[in-house]
Amino acid sequence: MDNVQEHDPDTQEHNNETQNHKQEDHSNSYQTRTIPFIEPLSREYQKRIILCQTVNGPCPIIALSNALILKSNVDRPFELPKKRYITPDELTEYLVEFAKAYGLCKNQQSLQDKLTSMHFGQQLNPCLYDIEKFEYGHEIFCTFGVRLVHGWILSDDMGLSDEDLSYLRKLEYYEKVADTFAERRSLLEMQEPLTEQQQDFLNNSTCVDKVMENRYTMQFLTNAGLKKILELVGPGEIVVVFRSSHFSTMYSNPDSFAQFTLVTDSGYARTGEDVVWETFDSQTVETGNGELCAANFIPAVYVLNQRKEEKKKRAKDDEQYAKRLAKEEEERGKKETPKKASNTPRRNKSNTQKSRKQSENCLIS
């Protein structure tokens, strides 16, 4: 007789609570995925464990960590353990230990505090005329030797005149432009008459409206900014790019000299090698999104279409093979079928004679 365990409601409830607790823990952790990556020096594919992102907020520390993972080499390795999930505290500890091992920071407590805050975002104030210049917020990337760039560079292709560009250059940083925009809104909404100075301010700062109204439409990336990134990020280099309040790990493919950002959306974590990169080019400027690519930088749509065609071909081949087997089985069955026996039963001679004798003995004379 099989052993039957009695159902215990308290135990079941405890198991459910434990399971829910584990799920809750995972929801606060970073999922990992393994991707093949062409190591720039050896030019060979290597397996790298990277971090994925589920919610908004931790993209700065994820981009920084993934950049270190892709930059990892025998002289300065940085690898994540083979775990499906990494907690924020674990990631902070890995980064602090890495910095400690290579003498990247003297004040470890200060570094740990900065890294901890990066799980919730990172404030930056980019310069509108230099892709590598920030007023603040870039220091942590400098500590780990990871270049930080952005593509929000102002130019005449935004409909700005030379006078506009000259005025904006004096503001220099994005936050100063945003403050000027807010001041303009406030003056335009005033009911009382403006002073001559206030009116001059409004007349001279109209260009600010163009910049601020287009910032989300253009996703904080301009053609001038893209051109600068292509010029200054060398082949095989790995950097972090800041765009539209988001941080991404960027790789410059040494074979094509094209730029790609690492896809870290957890929704693609189980796509294997099919979706690993996203192009960073003029399409990104025009639409805000690049084209998804496989690990070998071939557009994912081609890879998926090819796989669909291969699947259809396999299904068709399997169907033809099944039909051929069925036909062979049918022909074999026809050859092995025995001749049909006669339906008329054979008469037993001895029994017939015996019956005749019995009949003769029963005759009545």
UniProtKB/Swiss-Prot annotation:
Alphabetized UniProt keyword annotations: Cytoplasm
Basic and acidic residues bias locations: 1-27, 315-339
Domain of life: Eukaryota
Sequence segments annotated as region (Disordered): 1-31, 308-365
InterPro entries reported for this sequence: MINDY, MINDY_domain
Compartmental location: Cytoplasm
Example GO molecular function: cysteine-type deubiquitinase activity
Comp. bias (Polar residues): 340-353
CC per GO annotation: cytosol; nucleus
Entry's family note: To yeast YGL082w.
Quaternary structure (record): Interacts with sad1.
Entry protein name: Uncharacterized protein C12G12.11c
